[in-house]
Amino acid sequence: MRFLTGNVVVRARGADFFVAIDARSAGGADAWLALTNGAPLLRRFTLSPSAPTNLYDFTRAELRLWLSRRELNPVHAARIWSYLYLDLVEGFGAMTELPARVRARLEAEMCVGNLKIARETDSRDGFTRKYLLELADGAAIETVLMRFAGRATACVSSQVGCAMGCVFCATGQMGYTRHLTAGEIVAQAVHVARALRTAAFEKCHVMRDPSPGREAGEKSRDEADRHRAPPTPRLRNLVLMGMGEPLHNYEAVMRAVDILRDDGGLALGAERITLSTVGVVPGILRLAAEKRPVHLAVSLHAADQEERAALVPVAKKWPLDELMAACRTYSETTGRRVFYEWTLIEGRNDTAAHARAVGRLLRGLPAQVNLIPLNPTAGYDGTPGRTEAARRFQEILSREFALPSTVRQRRGIDIAAGCGQLAVAEQS
Protein backbone atom coordinates (compact mmCIF):
# COMPACT_ATOMS: atom_id res chain seq x y z
CA MET A 1 0.00 0.00 0.00
CA ARG A 2 1.26 3.50 -0.86
CA PHE A 3 -0.24 6.93 -0.28
CA LEU A 4 0.87 10.55 -0.34
CA THR A 5 0.37 13.28 2.22
CA GLY A 6 1.79 16.54 0.94
CA ASN A 7 5.32 15.74 -0.22
CA VAL A 8 5.66 12.72 2.04
CA VAL A 9 5.22 9.13 0.88
CA VAL A 10 4.09 6.43 3.30
CA ARG A 11 4.50 2.81 2.19
CA ALA A 12 3.03 0.05 4.34
CA ARG A 13 4.01 -3.63 4.32
CA GLY A 14 2.46 -5.79 7.00
CA ALA A 15 3.21 -4.36 10.42
CA ASP A 16 5.96 -2.15 9.02
CA PHE A 17 5.60 1.18 7.34
CA PHE A 18 8.19 3.38 5.66
CA VAL A 19 8.17 7.16 5.45
CA ALA A 20 10.14 9.18 2.88
CA ILE A 21 9.95 12.25 0.69
CA ASP A 22 8.42 11.82 -2.74
CA ALA A 23 11.44 12.13 -5.05
CA ARG A 24 9.20 13.57 -7.78
CA SER A 25 7.88 16.36 -5.61
CA ALA A 26 9.32 19.84 -5.41
CA GLY A 27 12.40 20.01 -3.28
CA GLY A 28 13.16 16.29 -3.19
CA ALA A 29 15.64 15.38 -0.47
CA ASP A 30 16.06 19.04 0.50
CA ALA A 31 12.35 19.20 1.28
CA TRP A 32 12.64 16.12 3.49
CA LEU A 33 15.50 17.66 5.45
CA ALA A 34 13.48 20.84 5.93
CA LEU A 35 10.47 18.87 7.14
CA THR A 36 12.39 16.66 9.56
CA ASN A 37 15.25 18.84 10.83
CA GLY A 38 17.80 16.68 9.06
CA ALA A 39 16.50 13.16 9.69
CA PRO A 40 17.60 10.50 7.16
CA LEU A 41 15.66 10.27 3.92
CA LEU A 42 13.94 6.99 4.72
CA ARG A 43 12.65 5.76 8.06
CA ARG A 44 11.11 2.42 9.02
CA PHE A 45 8.56 2.12 11.81
CA THR A 46 6.82 -0.95 13.21
CA LEU A 47 3.21 -0.83 14.31
CA SER A 48 2.25 -2.59 17.53
CA PRO A 49 -1.55 -2.55 17.49
CA SER A 50 -1.97 -4.44 20.77
CA ALA A 51 0.66 -2.61 22.81
CA PRO A 52 -0.60 -1.83 26.33
CA THR A 53 -0.65 1.72 27.66
CA ASN A 54 2.35 2.74 29.73
CA LEU A 55 1.15 3.56 33.24
CA TYR A 56 4.03 6.03 33.65
CA ASP A 57 2.38 8.24 31.01
CA PHE A 58 -0.43 9.13 33.44
CA THR A 59 -0.60 12.01 35.87
CA ARG A 60 -2.32 11.20 39.15
CA ALA A 61 -5.45 13.13 38.08
CA GLU A 62 -5.58 11.20 34.80
CA LEU A 63 -5.26 7.92 36.67
CA ARG A 64 -8.27 8.84 38.81
CA LEU A 65 -10.22 9.66 35.67
CA TRP A 66 -9.18 6.38 34.04
CA LEU A 67 -10.54 4.46 37.02
CA SER A 68 -13.79 6.45 37.10
CA ARG A 69 -14.48 5.84 33.42
CA ARG A 70 -14.24 2.11 34.06
CA GLU A 71 -16.60 2.34 37.04
CA LEU A 72 -13.74 1.67 39.44
CA ASN A 73 -13.27 3.67 42.62
CA PRO A 74 -10.85 6.55 41.87
CA VAL A 75 -9.59 6.39 45.45
CA HIS A 76 -7.35 3.53 44.31
CA ALA A 77 -5.30 5.99 42.25
CA ALA A 78 -3.38 7.06 45.35
CA ARG A 79 -2.34 3.49 46.16
CA ILE A 80 -1.41 2.75 42.55
CA TRP A 81 0.69 5.92 42.54
CA SER A 82 2.54 4.91 45.69
CA TYR A 83 3.16 1.44 44.26
CA LEU A 84 4.71 3.06 41.17
CA TYR A 85 6.81 5.83 42.70
CA LEU A 86 7.37 4.91 46.36
CA ASP A 87 7.45 1.11 46.29
CA LEU A 88 8.90 1.18 42.76
CA VAL A 89 7.16 -2.08 41.80
CA GLU A 90 7.99 -3.71 38.48
CA GLY A 91 4.61 -5.30 37.79
CA PHE A 92 0.99 -5.57 38.82
CA GLY A 93 1.62 -8.76 40.77
CA ALA A 94 3.22 -6.69 43.52
CA MET A 95 0.12 -4.50 43.90
CA THR A 96 -1.39 -6.91 46.38
CA GLU A 97 -3.49 -4.38 48.30
CA LEU A 98 -5.58 -3.46 45.27
CA PRO A 99 -8.96 -5.15 44.75
CA ALA A 100 -8.72 -8.03 42.29
CA ARG A 101 -11.10 -6.26 39.90
CA VAL A 102 -8.88 -3.17 39.74
CA ARG A 103 -5.72 -5.16 39.28
CA ALA A 104 -7.27 -7.29 36.55
CA ARG A 105 -8.32 -4.20 34.60
CA LEU A 106 -4.85 -2.70 34.94
CA GLU A 107 -3.24 -5.92 33.72
CA ALA A 108 -5.59 -6.02 30.73
CA GLU A 109 -4.91 -2.48 29.53
CA MET A 110 -1.67 -1.24 31.06
CA CYS A 111 1.99 -2.00 31.54
CA VAL A 112 4.35 -0.82 34.27
CA GLY A 113 6.93 0.80 32.03
CA ASN A 114 8.15 -0.53 28.71
CA LEU A 115 11.94 -0.45 29.07
CA LYS A 116 14.21 -3.49 29.09
CA ILE A 117 17.80 -3.40 30.27
CA ALA A 118 19.93 -4.49 27.33
CA ARG A 119 23.24 -3.69 29.00
CA GLU A 120 24.64 -1.94 32.06
CA THR A 121 28.23 -0.76 32.37
CA ASP A 122 30.17 0.59 35.35
CA SER A 123 33.04 3.05 35.12
CA ARG A 124 36.39 1.92 36.50
CA ASP A 125 36.31 4.46 39.32
CA GLY A 126 32.86 3.34 40.44
CA PHE A 127 31.22 6.77 40.21
CA THR A 128 29.08 6.16 37.16
CA ARG A 129 26.83 3.49 35.68
CA LYS A 130 25.39 3.60 32.16
CA TYR A 131 22.29 1.70 31.04
CA LEU A 132 21.41 0.73 27.50
CA LEU A 133 17.62 0.47 27.52
CA GLU A 134 15.49 -1.16 24.84
CA LEU A 135 12.09 0.38 24.10
CA ALA A 136 8.92 -1.46 23.14
CA ASP A 137 9.43 -0.76 19.41
CA GLY A 138 13.00 -2.08 19.43
CA ALA A 139 14.67 1.34 19.52
CA ALA A 140 17.23 1.96 22.26
CA ILE A 141 18.41 4.81 24.46
CA GLU A 142 21.06 5.37 27.11
CA THR A 143 20.56 6.56 30.69
CA VAL A 144 23.28 7.40 33.21
CA LEU A 145 23.34 7.11 37.00
CA MET A 146 25.81 8.98 39.20
CA ARG A 147 26.26 8.34 42.90
CA PHE A 148 26.87 10.99 45.53
CA ALA A 149 26.98 10.99 49.33
CA GLY A 150 23.50 9.86 50.34
CA ARG A 151 21.86 10.72 47.03
CA ALA A 152 22.14 10.19 43.30
CA THR A 153 21.59 11.93 39.97
CA ALA A 154 19.91 10.45 36.90
CA CYS A 155 20.75 11.72 33.42
CA VAL A 156 17.81 10.80 31.19
CA SER A 157 17.19 10.89 27.46
CA SER A 158 14.30 12.72 25.79
CA GLN A 159 14.61 11.34 22.25
CA VAL A 160 15.97 8.38 20.33
CA GLY A 161 18.89 10.17 18.71
CA CYS A 162 18.87 13.90 18.07
CA ALA A 163 18.09 16.15 15.10
CA MET A 164 20.28 19.07 16.20
CA GLY A 165 23.52 17.68 14.76
CA CYS A 166 26.13 19.25 17.07
CA VAL A 167 29.39 18.18 15.45
CA PHE A 168 31.17 16.97 18.60
CA CYS A 169 28.16 15.14 20.10
CA ALA A 170 27.79 11.39 19.59
CA THR A 171 23.99 11.60 19.83
CA GLY A 172 23.90 14.27 17.13
CA GLN A 173 26.15 12.12 14.97
CA MET A 174 23.70 9.19 15.10
CA GLY A 175 20.78 11.24 13.75
CA TYR A 176 17.17 11.44 14.91
CA THR A 177 14.66 8.58 15.07
CA ARG A 178 11.76 9.70 17.27
CA HIS A 179 10.60 11.49 20.40
CA LEU A 180 10.25 9.61 23.64
CA THR A 181 6.87 9.61 25.34
CA ALA A 182 6.50 11.12 28.79
CA GLY A 183 6.19 7.61 30.19
CA GLU A 184 9.45 6.53 28.59
CA ILE A 185 11.20 9.52 30.17
CA VAL A 186 9.63 8.87 33.58
CA ALA A 187 10.49 5.16 33.37
CA GLN A 188 14.20 6.01 33.12
CA ALA A 189 14.08 7.93 36.39
CA VAL A 190 12.11 5.16 38.08
CA HIS A 191 14.60 2.58 36.82
CA VAL A 192 17.47 4.54 38.38
CA ALA A 193 15.57 4.96 41.66
CA ARG A 194 14.85 1.23 41.71
CA ALA A 195 18.49 0.36 41.00
CA LEU A 196 19.56 2.45 43.97
CA ARG A 197 17.55 0.17 46.25
CA THR A 198 19.60 -2.86 45.28
CA ALA A 199 23.01 -3.83 46.62
CA ALA A 200 24.59 -3.28 43.20
CA PHE A 201 26.33 -0.08 44.26
CA GLU A 202 27.40 -0.88 47.82
CA LYS A 203 31.09 -0.77 46.92
CA CYS A 204 30.88 2.28 44.67
CA HIS A 205 32.62 5.50 45.60
CA VAL A 206 30.40 8.55 45.82
CA MET A 207 30.68 12.27 45.11
CA ARG A 208 29.17 15.32 46.71
CA ASP A 209 26.03 16.58 45.04
CA PRO A 210 26.82 18.91 42.12
CA SER A 211 25.29 22.30 41.59
CA PRO A 212 22.45 22.50 39.05
CA GLY A 213 23.38 22.33 35.41
CA ARG A 214 25.96 19.55 35.52
CA GLU A 215 25.67 16.58 33.23
CA ALA A 216 25.89 12.88 33.88
CA GLY A 217 29.39 11.58 34.34
CA GLU A 218 30.68 15.06 35.29
CA LYS A 219 31.57 17.01 38.45
CA SER A 220 33.74 19.96 39.38
CA ARG A 221 37.30 19.39 40.58
CA ASP A 222 36.70 20.87 44.01
CA GLU A 223 33.86 18.48 44.83
CA ALA A 224 35.58 15.09 44.92
CA ASP A 225 34.48 13.11 47.95
CA ARG A 226 35.30 9.44 48.29
CA HIS A 227 33.27 8.59 51.39
CA ARG A 228 31.26 5.42 51.23
CA ALA A 229 27.61 5.74 50.34
CA PRO A 230 24.83 4.90 52.78
CA PRO A 231 22.99 1.67 51.92
CA THR A 232 19.88 3.35 50.44
CA PRO A 233 20.79 6.62 48.70
CA ARG A 234 17.92 8.54 47.21
CA LEU A 235 17.44 9.81 43.67
CA ARG A 236 17.82 13.51 44.35
CA ASN A 237 18.60 15.19 41.02
CA LEU A 238 17.46 14.68 37.47
CA VAL A 239 19.15 16.20 34.43
CA LEU A 240 17.58 16.15 30.97
CA MET A 241 20.98 15.99 29.33
CA GLY A 242 20.97 12.51 27.83
CA MET A 243 20.16 11.68 24.23
CA GLY A 244 18.02 14.22 22.40
CA GLU A 245 16.99 17.87 22.57
CA PRO A 246 14.39 18.28 25.35
CA LEU A 247 12.83 21.44 23.89
CA HIS A 248 12.32 19.63 20.56
CA ASN A 249 10.04 17.28 22.52
CA TYR A 250 8.51 19.93 24.77
CA GLU A 251 5.09 18.45 25.56
CA ALA A 252 6.35 15.01 26.57
CA VAL A 253 9.26 16.42 28.56
CA MET A 254 7.09 18.81 30.55
CA ARG A 255 4.50 16.13 31.23
CA ALA A 256 7.33 13.92 32.54
CA VAL A 257 8.58 16.78 34.73
CA ASP A 258 5.10 17.24 36.19
CA ILE A 259 4.83 13.52 36.99
CA LEU A 260 8.29 13.37 38.55
CA ARG A 261 7.63 16.45 40.69
CA ASP A 262 4.38 15.05 42.15
CA ASP A 263 4.67 15.20 45.95
CA GLY A 264 3.15 11.74 46.29
CA GLY A 265 5.82 10.11 44.16
CA LEU A 266 9.49 10.71 43.45
CA ALA A 267 8.89 14.33 44.50
CA LEU A 268 11.83 15.87 42.66
CA GLY A 269 11.77 19.54 43.60
CA ALA A 270 12.12 22.49 41.24
CA GLU A 271 15.73 23.00 42.32
CA ARG A 272 16.55 19.40 41.45
CA ILE A 273 15.64 19.22 37.75
CA THR A 274 17.86 20.71 35.05
CA LEU A 275 17.01 20.88 31.35
CA SER A 276 19.76 21.41 28.79
CA THR A 277 19.04 22.85 25.35
CA VAL A 278 21.18 23.53 22.33
CA GLY A 279 19.29 26.79 21.91
CA VAL A 280 15.73 26.13 20.69
CA VAL A 281 14.51 29.69 21.04
CA PRO A 282 10.72 29.06 20.91
CA GLY A 283 11.11 26.46 23.64
CA ILE A 284 13.10 28.82 25.87
CA LEU A 285 10.47 31.52 25.46
CA ARG A 286 7.72 29.03 26.24
CA LEU A 287 9.59 27.91 29.36
CA ALA A 288 9.73 31.56 30.39
CA ALA A 289 6.05 32.24 29.68
CA GLU A 290 4.94 29.14 31.58
CA LYS A 291 7.50 29.72 34.37
CA ARG A 292 8.31 26.06 34.45
CA PRO A 293 10.07 25.02 37.68
CA VAL A 294 13.31 23.71 36.18
CA HIS A 295 16.86 24.97 35.84
CA LEU A 296 17.83 25.94 32.29
CA ALA A 297 21.23 25.12 30.81
CA VAL A 298 22.16 26.37 27.34
CA SER A 299 24.85 24.77 25.20
CA LEU A 300 26.74 27.86 24.07
CA HIS A 301 30.25 26.73 23.01
CA ALA A 302 31.01 29.91 21.02
CA ALA A 303 30.37 33.63 21.47
CA ASP A 304 30.50 34.39 17.74
CA GLN A 305 27.63 33.51 15.40
CA GLU A 306 29.79 32.06 12.63
CA GLU A 307 31.89 30.00 15.03
CA ARG A 308 28.82 28.73 16.86
CA ALA A 309 27.03 27.75 13.67
CA ALA A 310 30.05 25.65 12.69
CA LEU A 311 29.79 23.69 15.94
CA VAL A 312 26.02 23.85 16.49
CA PRO A 313 24.17 23.82 13.14
CA VAL A 314 20.85 24.84 14.71
CA ALA A 315 22.43 28.27 15.28
CA LYS A 316 21.71 28.92 11.60
CA LYS A 317 18.00 28.71 12.39
CA TRP A 318 18.17 30.52 15.74
CA PRO A 319 21.16 32.89 15.58
CA LEU A 320 23.16 33.88 18.62
CA ASP A 321 21.49 37.28 19.03
CA GLU A 322 18.04 35.65 19.08
CA LEU A 323 19.24 33.03 21.55
CA MET A 324 20.68 35.60 23.94
CA ALA A 325 17.53 37.72 23.72
CA ALA A 326 15.48 34.64 24.63
CA CYS A 327 17.78 33.87 27.57
CA ARG A 328 17.47 37.45 28.80
CA THR A 329 13.68 37.20 28.59
CA TYR A 330 13.80 33.89 30.45
CA SER A 331 15.83 35.34 33.32
CA GLU A 332 13.75 38.52 33.52
CA THR A 333 10.49 36.56 33.54
CA THR A 334 11.44 33.74 35.90
CA GLY A 335 14.08 35.39 38.08
CA ARG A 336 16.37 32.43 37.40
CA ARG A 337 19.93 32.46 36.17
CA VAL A 338 20.92 30.42 33.13
CA PHE A 339 23.78 27.93 33.08
CA TYR A 340 25.85 28.32 29.92
CA GLU A 341 27.75 25.21 28.86
CA TRP A 342 31.06 25.61 27.05
CA THR A 343 32.81 22.55 25.66
CA LEU A 344 36.53 23.37 25.65
CA ILE A 345 38.18 22.34 22.37
CA GLU A 346 41.89 22.97 22.12
CA GLY A 347 42.73 25.66 19.59
CA ARG A 348 39.07 26.17 18.74
CA ASN A 349 37.41 27.97 21.65
CA ASP A 350 39.77 27.80 24.65
CA THR A 351 41.88 30.96 24.36
CA ALA A 352 41.91 34.09 26.49
CA ALA A 353 40.20 35.92 23.63
CA HIS A 354 37.36 33.39 23.70
CA ALA A 355 36.99 33.83 27.46
CA ARG A 356 36.69 37.60 27.10
CA ALA A 357 34.16 37.17 24.29
CA VAL A 358 32.01 35.05 26.61
CA GLY A 359 32.33 37.62 29.37
CA ARG A 360 31.18 40.41 27.08
CA LEU A 361 28.31 38.30 25.72
CA LEU A 362 26.99 37.47 29.19
CA ARG A 363 27.67 40.83 30.83
CA GLY A 364 24.66 41.97 32.85
CA LEU A 365 22.92 38.58 32.73
CA PRO A 366 22.35 36.29 35.72
CA ALA A 367 24.60 33.51 34.49
CA GLN A 368 27.06 30.78 35.35
CA VAL A 369 29.47 29.22 32.86
CA ASN A 370 30.13 25.49 33.03
CA LEU A 371 33.43 24.67 31.31
CA ILE A 372 33.54 21.10 30.01
CA PRO A 373 36.69 19.61 28.45
CA LEU A 374 35.76 17.93 25.16
CA ASN A 375 34.94 14.24 25.52
CA PRO A 376 36.02 11.88 22.72
CA THR A 377 33.52 10.67 20.13
CA ALA A 378 34.09 8.62 17.00
CA GLY A 379 32.70 11.28 14.68
CA TYR A 380 34.73 14.32 15.76
CA ASP A 381 38.48 14.77 15.62
CA GLY A 382 39.11 17.31 18.35
CA THR A 383 41.34 17.62 21.41
CA PRO A 384 40.08 18.55 24.89
CA GLY A 385 41.13 21.96 26.16
CA ARG A 386 44.12 21.63 28.49
CA THR A 387 43.87 22.12 32.23
CA GLU A 388 45.89 25.33 32.16
CA ALA A 389 43.67 26.75 29.40
CA ALA A 390 40.56 25.95 31.45
CA ARG A 391 42.02 27.65 34.52
CA ARG A 392 42.99 30.72 32.52
CA PHE A 393 39.51 30.84 31.00
CA GLN A 394 37.94 30.64 34.45
CA GLU A 395 40.26 33.27 35.92
CA ILE A 396 39.41 35.75 33.16
CA LEU A 397 35.68 35.24 33.67
CA SER A 398 36.04 35.77 37.40
CA ARG A 399 38.61 38.59 37.50
CA GLU A 400 37.48 40.69 34.55
CA PHE A 401 33.74 40.01 34.48
CA ALA A 402 32.82 38.75 37.98
CA LEU A 403 31.20 35.80 36.21
CA PRO A 404 30.97 32.54 38.20
CA SER A 405 32.11 29.37 36.50
CA THR A 406 33.03 25.75 37.14
CA VAL A 407 35.58 23.51 35.47
CA ARG A 408 34.30 19.99 35.25
CA GLN A 409 36.35 16.93 35.96
CA ARG A 410 35.67 14.23 33.38
CA ARG A 411 33.80 11.22 34.73
CA GLY A 412 32.53 8.05 33.08
CA ILE A 413 34.63 8.70 29.97
CA ASP A 414 35.91 5.11 29.93
CA ILE A 415 32.33 3.88 29.40
CA ALA A 416 31.29 6.75 27.08
CA ALA A 417 28.97 8.19 29.73
CA GLY A 418 30.32 11.75 29.73
CA CYS A 419 28.80 14.87 28.24
CA GLY A 420 28.26 14.41 24.49
CA GLN A 421 29.12 10.70 24.47
CA LEU A 422 25.72 9.00 24.67
CA ALA A 423 24.75 7.16 21.48
CA VAL A 424 23.37 3.88 20.21
CA ALA A 425 25.25 2.34 17.30
CA GLU A 426 22.26 0.93 15.43
CA GLN A 427 18.59 1.84 15.29
CA SER A 428 15.92 -0.07 13.41
UniProtKB/Swiss-Prot annotation:
The UniProt record lists the keyword Mitochondrion: no
Top enzyme category: transferase
Region described as Disordered: spans on this chain: 207-232
Cellular-component GO terms for this entry: cytoplasm
Cofactor(s) essential for the protein: [4Fe-4S] cluster
Keywords: 4Fe-4S, Cytoplasm, Disulfide bond, Iron, Iron-sulfur, Metal-binding, Methyltransferase, rRNA processing, S-adenosyl-L-methionine, Transferase, tRNA processing
Principal location listed in the UniProt entry: cytoplasm
GO biological process annotation, one example: tRNA methylation
Catalytic reaction(s) noted: adenosine(2503) in 23S rRNA + 2 reduced [2Fe-2S]-[ferredoxin] + 2 S-adenosyl-L-methionine = 2-methyladenosine(2503) in 23S rRNA + 5'-deoxyadenosine + L-methionine + 2 oxidized [2Fe-2S]-[ferredoxin] + S-adenosyl-L-homocysteine; adenosine(37) in tRNA + 2 reduced [2Fe-2S]-[ferredoxin] + 2 S-adenosyl-L-methionine = 2-methyladenosine(37) in tRNA + 5'-deoxyadenosine + L-methionine + 2 oxidized [2Fe-2S]-[ferredoxin] + S-adenosyl-L-homocysteine
Radical SAM core domain location: 148-414
PROSITE patterns: RADICAL_SAM (PS51918)
InterPro entries: Aldolase_TIM, Methyltransferase_A, RlmN_N, RNA_MTrfase_RlmN, rRNA_lsu_MTrfase_RlmN/Cfr, rSAM
Domain of life: Bacteria
Residues of the active site: E142, C419
Cystine pairings recorded for this chain: C155-C419
Family annotation (Gene3D superfamilies): 1.10.150.530, Aldolase class I
Function of the protein: Specifically methylates position 2 of adenine 2503 in 23S rRNA and position 2 of adenine 37 in tRNAs.
Miscellaneous: Reaction proceeds by a ping-pong mechanism involving intermediate methylation of a conserved cysteine residue.
Name by which UniProt lists this protein: Probable dual-specificity RNA methyltransferase RlmN 2
Organism: Opitutus terrae (strain DSM 11246 / JCM 15787 / PB90-1)
Gene name as annotated: rlmN2
